[in-house]
């Protein structure tokens, strides 16, 4: 009987957190948000059967932060039980893998493995409940470094602080790196992030050389 009651509460908690996430996601902002909103809307109807039936939901740094804060507030108010948040390695900053996750970095640094390690260490320093750093993952041993985390939402104000400090860090590590590699969309995202956190946090941005000017200088130099 107790197991059945637990299953009811677990299912109710899933439904409540589904609705809470939907309230935070703006489906009209961009197609990806609309897709994520529809996915979480239909998650209960699709009757997931793997493991705990936990949801995989992709959001940007601030979307993840806001959803985590909402969940933690729901735990604090007794609306749901404690929640474990985590993420997989198909993410911006958690994995160095030149054959997959970092294959779109074209400045030559895609073969270095410092990003996942920095992400791992930063998550530890910011108070994540669980952190992991390991070799391999999808592309094979020696071809990737993966880092992950788990964060228990217990309803405490301390966890609110950890969310505010660690969730944006975990995501923006990878956006920052692609920004430094001159990825146009990452540069736009970092510029928006810096504007949002002006006075409290900032990510350095690359100085983009003028291709026409460089070509002109080389032509003039080689013509002499």
Predicted regions and their residues:
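Single conserved hydrophobic/aromatic residue that forms the stacking wall/gate
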Residues: 1-5, 9
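Extended, well-ordered protein cores
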Residues: 17, 22-56, 63-70, 76-78, ...
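General structural feature for long, well-ordered alpha-helical segments within catalytic domains
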Residues: 21, 36-39, 63-71, 81, ...
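Short, basic, glycine/proline-bearing loop/turn elements
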Residues: 53-57, 97-109
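Generic secondary-structure signature for well-ordered alpha-helical cores
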Residues: 63, 69-81, 122-130, 167-176, ...
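Catalytic or ion-translocation cores adjacent to nucleophile or general acid/base/metal-coordination motifs
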Residues: 108, 112-116, 120-124, 128-130, ...
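C-terminal catalytic or substrate-handling cores of phosphate/nucleotide-
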Residues: 190-224
